[in-house]
Amino acid sequence: MTTPRLHLRYKVEFPATFAGDHAGMGIVYNLGVGGCKMVSHRKVKCGDLLSVHLNVPEQNTPISILAAKVQWVLEHGFGVEFLEIQKVEQARLERFLDAQGHLAT
């Protein structure tokens, strides 16, 4: 049985990079203040800790997540839970999400 999400997720599609035990690039397909789904050809494992840099549209500087934990893995994608984010970056993420109109299913 899975644990329900605490935060809404929004349909998005933009690039991101991640680093940690594994580093790579991917595309974020849904995003909330608590985490995101990324599609990438780079392999990660459940439990891996990563830093994530979200290259959100119309912003010159990526939103940086200091620590995120891989919660699930599929063939070409994975889900991360955001564990640590600076307050300034959290506010940027929340402003971006407030402007999104489509909830992820």
Where are the regions that the model predicts?
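N-terminal helix initiation/capping motif
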Residues: M1-L31, E94, D98-T105
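Short strand-loop-strand
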Residues: V12-C46, S51-H53, G77-G79
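A residue-level detector for short acidic-glycine micro-motifs
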Residues: G20, N30, V70-W72, E84
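Short coil-to-beta-strand transition motifs
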Residues: G20-A23, Q59-L66
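Residues located in well-ordered beta-strands
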Residues: I27, A67-K69, E81
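Short, compositionally biased
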Residues: S64-E75
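C-terminal output/interaction extensions
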Residues: G77-T105
